[in-house]
Design a protein with these regions (language model features):
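A short, sequence-level motif marking secondary-structure junctions
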Residues: 201-203, 242-243
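Edge beta-strands of extracellular beta-sandwich domains
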Residues: 232-243
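Extended substrate-binding grooves/exosites of carbohydrate-active enzymes
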Residues: 1-202, 209-218, 222, 226-231
Length: 244
């Protein structure tokens, strides 16, 4: 027999960085622990420069004092349902499940957002938004997180996020940019200038270490990610970001 509990670390309660504690607890109690029900909801195209942290805190944005951070006891109720947060949550969960040799397995139970009579209070009433694609089959950013871990046949690179083309912030404040890929290394360029090569390591977070702090210029910015495959071929992804 296989045991698969519901563990909603970082959604209905707690923080997603407490996931390992829950996993360790059930591994001791059950020899065949498979986890299939976890995650959270997100709106396609909703983004924030400051997603709730892995510790379950609303974080400051450089110009605020860190002391004003506040805890979020139930992110499902008071969170912003941004794609950024759910990407981080899934990334953390997969990082643990893929690297824990005592973990029997993992599956994603909701591939697509779906209608339900049980969710009249949701931002989109009667729709459960825990899927990796929306009702029109448009992939959310979380789709590419899973693809980076579970697809080893089709090389790809995806700059987070193609639905986040307008960003803002104080001049000189670097912004985080992640690239999700199943290739071994990525080089990221900003307006044709290399920001360095990083190697993928699933023990690293976020994006298996494929993360850069980018100093956007005012106006249009062109981000280019170039991945190298095992065969030496190059895979490219490009994104235009308007920064103000």
């Amino acid at each position: 027999d296989v045991f698969s509990p519901s563990i909603w670390s970082g959604w209905y309660s707690g923080s997603y960085k407490s996931y390992q504690k829950a996993v360790d607890k059930y591994k001791k109690e059950y020899k065949h622990f498979l986890h299939t029900e976890y995650g959270g909801s997100s709106h396609v195209g909703r983004h924030t420069e400051n997603p709730i942290t892995g510790e379950g805190k609303i974080q400051a944005d450089g110009w605020e004092e860190a002391i004003v951070q506040s805890d979020v006891p139930n992110i499902a109720k008071v969170g912003d349902w941004s794609e950024n947060y759910i990407v981080d949550l899934f990334d953390w969960h997969l990082r643990i499940s893929e690297n824990d040799t005592a973990f029997v397995g993992n599956a994603q139970w909701a591939f697509k957002d779906f209608g339900t009579p049980l969710r009249p209070e949701n931002p989109i009433p009667y729709v459960n938004q825990k899927g990796l694609v929306d009702r029109n089959n448009n992939p959310k950013d979380a789709f590419y997180v899973f693809k980076s871990y579970w697809n080893d046949t089709t090389p790809f690179a995806y700059i987070e996020s193609h639905t986040w083309t307008n960003r803002q912030g104080p001049k000189g404040l670097k912004r985080s940019v992640s690239v999700y890929s199943n290739c071994s290394e990525i080089e990221l360029f900003l307006n044709g200038k290399s920001l360095g090569v990083k190697k993928r390591n699933t023990n690293d977070f976020p994006a298996a270490g494929l993360n850069w702090n980018v100093d956007f210029v005012d106006g249009n910015n062109v981000l280019t990610a170039i991945a190298k495959t095992k065969d030496g071929d190059e895979i490219k992804d490009e994104l235009n970001v308007n920064y103000r």
